[in-house]
Amino acid sequence: MAAGYILAYVDVTDPVQYEQYKVLSTKAMQAHGAEVLVRGGKTEQLEGEWAPTRVVLLKFPSYDAAKVFYDSEEYRAARDARAKAAKMNMIVVEGV
């Protein structure tokens, strides 16, 4: 079975409130078996117009597991905490 990945780029607008999101999202990731591959760190634009300030890449056992995480009560609480703390763009993608 191919792994599932969640790729997000984040524009943090309220760093203090975003810390609460990070606490809650970490608990949700642990509960759903996410492997954190990227969480912040240095970025550099190589091509195009995409220049996110923060990137997150999570690996799950499957595409469906990634979607279950996203729809979970645990992650819903994190999303609620993030609502006024950051602008988020997120996709789920199936690995090879």
PLM segments and residue spans:
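C-terminal structural segments of small proteins and small subunits
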Residues: 63-91
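Short S/T/G/P-rich N-terminal loop/turn motif that feeds into the first structured element of a domain
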Residues: 1-55, 59-71, 94-96
